[in-house]
Amino acid sequence: QCLVGSEMCIRDRDGRLTVDFEKQGEMAATDIVERIGTGKVAIIQGISGAAQSEGRTNGAKKVFESTEGVEVVSVQPADWDSQKAYNAAADLVKANPDLKAIFCCNDVMALAASEALTDNKAKEGILIYGVDGTEEAKNAIKEGRMDGSITYPSSVYAKAAVVMLMKLSQGMEMDDVVYCPLDVINTDNISEFDGYK
Protein backbone atom coordinates (compact mmCIF):
# COMPACT_ATOMS: atom_id res chain seq x y z
CA GLN A 1 0.00 0.00 0.00
CA CYS A 2 1.32 3.42 -0.95
CA LEU A 3 0.23 6.88 0.14
CA VAL A 4 -1.50 8.80 -2.64
CA GLY A 5 0.94 11.19 -4.33
CA SER A 6 3.89 9.76 -2.42
CA GLU A 7 6.60 7.21 -2.94
CA MET A 8 6.19 6.08 0.68
CA CYS A 9 4.80 2.57 0.82
CA ILE A 10 3.86 0.30 3.70
CA ARG A 11 5.17 -3.17 3.01
CA ASP A 12 4.98 -4.56 6.52
CA ARG A 13 4.58 -3.30 10.04
CA ASP A 14 7.70 -2.63 12.08
CA GLY A 15 5.97 -2.68 15.44
CA ARG A 16 2.65 -2.33 17.17
CA LEU A 17 1.73 0.11 19.93
CA THR A 18 -1.14 -1.08 22.08
CA VAL A 19 -2.62 -1.35 25.55
CA ASP A 20 -2.72 -4.57 27.55
CA PHE A 21 -6.48 -4.84 28.08
CA GLU A 22 -6.19 -7.86 30.36
CA LYS A 23 -3.72 -5.96 32.54
CA GLN A 24 -6.27 -3.14 32.88
CA GLY A 25 -8.81 -5.61 34.25
CA GLU A 26 -6.25 -7.15 36.59
CA MET A 27 -5.23 -3.75 37.95
CA ALA A 28 -8.82 -2.70 38.62
CA ALA A 29 -9.71 -5.99 40.30
CA THR A 30 -6.55 -5.95 42.42
CA ASP A 31 -7.33 -2.47 43.69
CA ILE A 32 -10.93 -3.48 44.40
CA VAL A 33 -9.85 -6.60 46.32
CA GLU A 34 -7.39 -4.58 48.39
CA ARG A 35 -10.26 -2.33 49.43
CA ILE A 36 -13.08 -4.81 50.02
CA GLY A 37 -11.12 -7.81 51.28
CA THR A 38 -13.97 -10.26 50.67
CA GLY A 39 -17.49 -10.18 49.28
CA LYS A 40 -19.61 -10.27 46.16
CA VAL A 41 -18.51 -8.47 43.00
CA ALA A 42 -19.94 -8.04 39.50
CA ILE A 43 -18.57 -7.18 36.07
CA ILE A 44 -20.37 -5.12 33.43
CA GLN A 45 -18.77 -5.77 30.05
CA GLY A 46 -18.77 -3.83 26.82
CA ILE A 47 -19.63 -5.69 23.63
CA SER A 48 -19.26 -9.42 24.11
CA GLY A 49 -16.35 -10.64 21.99
CA ALA A 50 -14.69 -7.23 21.57
CA ALA A 51 -10.98 -7.32 22.44
CA GLN A 52 -11.16 -4.53 25.03
CA SER A 53 -14.20 -6.02 26.72
CA GLU A 54 -12.95 -9.60 26.78
CA GLY A 55 -9.44 -8.66 27.88
CA ARG A 56 -10.60 -6.45 30.74
CA THR A 57 -13.20 -9.00 31.83
CA ASN A 58 -10.76 -11.91 31.76
CA GLY A 59 -8.15 -9.94 33.69
CA ALA A 60 -10.62 -8.95 36.38
CA LYS A 61 -12.11 -12.44 36.64
CA LYS A 62 -8.66 -13.95 37.03
CA VAL A 63 -7.96 -11.79 40.07
CA PHE A 64 -11.43 -12.10 41.60
CA GLU A 65 -11.66 -15.85 41.15
CA SER A 66 -8.19 -16.45 42.58
CA THR A 67 -8.98 -14.44 45.73
CA GLU A 68 -10.44 -16.44 48.59
CA GLY A 69 -13.67 -14.96 49.86
CA VAL A 70 -14.46 -13.00 46.69
CA GLU A 71 -17.42 -14.21 44.63
CA VAL A 72 -18.24 -13.05 41.09
CA VAL A 73 -22.05 -13.04 41.09
CA SER A 74 -22.59 -11.64 37.59
CA VAL A 75 -20.78 -10.96 34.32
CA GLN A 76 -23.05 -9.32 31.77
CA PRO A 77 -22.55 -7.24 28.62
CA ALA A 78 -23.93 -3.71 28.33
CA ASP A 79 -22.46 -3.02 24.86
CA TRP A 80 -20.61 0.15 26.01
CA ASP A 81 -24.09 1.68 26.36
CA SER A 82 -24.85 3.90 29.35
CA GLN A 83 -28.55 3.05 29.53
CA LYS A 84 -27.87 -0.69 29.41
CA ALA A 85 -25.21 -0.29 32.09
CA TYR A 86 -27.63 1.73 34.22
CA ASN A 87 -30.26 -1.02 33.94
CA ALA A 88 -27.71 -3.76 34.63
CA ALA A 89 -26.43 -2.02 37.76
CA ALA A 90 -29.94 -1.36 39.04
CA ASP A 91 -30.83 -5.03 38.59
CA LEU A 92 -27.58 -6.12 40.24
CA VAL A 93 -28.16 -4.25 43.49
CA LYS A 94 -31.75 -5.44 43.70
CA ALA A 95 -30.67 -9.06 43.27
CA ASN A 96 -27.56 -8.68 45.44
CA PRO A 97 -28.13 -6.16 48.24
CA ASP A 98 -24.83 -7.25 49.81
CA LEU A 99 -22.80 -6.49 46.67
CA LYS A 100 -19.39 -4.95 47.41
CA ALA A 101 -18.15 -3.78 44.00
CA ILE A 102 -18.94 -3.38 40.30
CA PHE A 103 -16.16 -3.32 37.72
CA CYS A 104 -17.27 -1.77 34.43
CA CYS A 105 -15.16 -2.21 31.31
CA ASN A 106 -15.19 1.54 30.58
CA ASP A 107 -15.90 4.80 32.36
CA VAL A 108 -19.10 5.56 30.43
CA MET A 109 -20.72 2.45 31.88
CA ALA A 110 -19.20 3.04 35.32
CA LEU A 111 -20.71 6.53 35.46
CA ALA A 112 -24.09 5.08 34.49
CA ALA A 113 -23.75 2.34 37.12
CA SER A 114 -22.98 4.99 39.73
CA GLU A 115 -26.09 6.91 38.75
CA ALA A 116 -28.19 3.76 39.00
CA LEU A 117 -26.90 2.98 42.47
CA THR A 118 -27.49 6.54 43.62
CA ASP A 119 -31.03 6.52 42.24
CA ASN A 120 -31.67 3.24 44.06
CA LYS A 121 -30.09 4.61 47.27
CA ALA A 122 -27.55 1.80 47.11
CA LYS A 123 -24.20 3.50 46.35
CA GLU A 124 -22.95 3.55 49.94
CA GLY A 125 -20.67 0.57 50.54
CA ILE A 126 -20.39 -0.43 46.87
CA LEU A 127 -17.22 0.39 44.93
CA ILE A 128 -17.49 1.31 41.25
CA TYR A 129 -14.48 1.11 38.95
CA GLY A 130 -14.15 1.85 35.25
CA VAL A 131 -11.45 2.07 32.60
CA ASP A 132 -10.15 5.01 30.54
CA GLY A 133 -9.40 7.68 33.14
CA THR A 134 -11.70 10.20 31.47
CA GLU A 135 -12.22 13.70 32.85
CA GLU A 136 -15.79 12.77 33.78
CA ALA A 137 -14.58 9.72 35.69
CA LYS A 138 -11.88 11.69 37.50
CA ASN A 139 -14.46 14.26 38.57
CA ALA A 140 -16.73 11.44 39.74
CA ILE A 141 -13.89 9.95 41.80
CA LYS A 142 -13.23 13.35 43.40
CA GLU A 143 -16.93 13.66 44.23
CA GLY A 144 -17.27 10.10 45.56
CA ARG A 145 -19.56 8.91 42.76
CA MET A 146 -16.89 6.51 41.44
CA ASP A 147 -14.02 4.87 43.28
CA GLY A 148 -11.44 4.14 40.61
CA SER A 149 -10.45 3.92 36.97
CA ILE A 150 -7.55 2.53 34.96
CA THR A 151 -5.87 4.91 32.55
CA TYR A 152 -6.06 4.58 28.79
CA PRO A 153 -3.54 7.38 28.25
CA SER A 154 -4.18 9.00 24.86
CA SER A 155 -1.41 11.58 25.25
CA VAL A 156 1.10 8.93 26.35
CA TYR A 157 -0.08 6.76 23.46
CA ALA A 158 0.55 9.61 20.99
CA LYS A 159 3.99 10.42 22.44
CA ALA A 160 5.00 6.76 22.34
CA ALA A 161 3.95 6.55 18.69
CA VAL A 162 6.13 9.56 17.84
CA VAL A 163 9.09 8.03 19.67
CA MET A 164 8.58 4.77 17.78
CA LEU A 165 8.54 6.62 14.44
CA MET A 166 11.69 8.55 15.34
CA LYS A 167 13.51 5.36 16.28
CA LEU A 168 12.39 3.62 13.10
CA SER A 169 13.47 6.57 10.95
CA GLN A 170 16.93 6.28 12.52
CA GLY A 171 17.13 2.57 11.76
CA MET A 172 16.86 1.49 15.38
CA GLU A 173 15.46 -1.90 16.35
CA MET A 174 11.92 -2.00 17.76
CA ASP A 175 10.07 -4.58 19.81
CA ASP A 176 7.28 -6.24 17.85
CA VAL A 177 4.72 -5.08 20.42
CA VAL A 178 5.08 -2.03 22.67
CA TYR A 179 2.61 -1.66 25.55
CA CYS A 180 1.65 1.75 26.92
CA PRO A 181 2.13 2.26 30.67
CA LEU A 182 -1.00 2.12 32.82
CA ASP A 183 -1.98 3.64 36.15
CA VAL A 184 -4.70 3.06 38.74
CA ILE A 185 -6.61 6.23 39.60
CA ASN A 186 -8.49 6.03 42.89
CA THR A 187 -9.65 8.15 45.79
CA ASP A 188 -6.18 8.02 47.36
CA ASN A 189 -4.23 9.43 44.41
CA ILE A 190 -6.79 11.36 42.34
CA SER A 191 -5.03 14.68 43.02
CA GLU A 192 -1.95 13.38 41.20
CA PHE A 193 -3.91 13.09 37.95
CA ASP A 194 -5.12 16.67 37.55
CA GLY A 195 -4.49 17.62 33.93
CA TYR A 196 -3.60 14.03 32.99
CA LYS A 197 -4.89 12.94 29.58
Label each region the model flagged.
Residues 24-28, 51-70, 84, 88, ...:
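Short, solvent-exposed amphipathic alpha-helices that sit
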Residues 44-48, 52, 63-67, 73, ...:
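Hinge/cleft segment of the Venus flytrap/periplasmic-binding protein
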Residues 1-5, 9-10:
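Single conserved hydrophobic/aromatic residue that forms the stacking wall/gate
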Residues 60, 73-74, 78-139:
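Hydrophobic alpha-helical
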Residues 14-15, 40-48:
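Short beta-strand segments enriched in small/hydrophobic residues
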Residues 17-41, 55, 84-86, 134-137, ...:
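Hydrophobic alpha-helical segments within soluble ligand-binding/sensing domains
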Residues 144-151:
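Rossmann-fold dehydrogenase core element
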Residues 14, 100, 147:
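Conserved acidic residues
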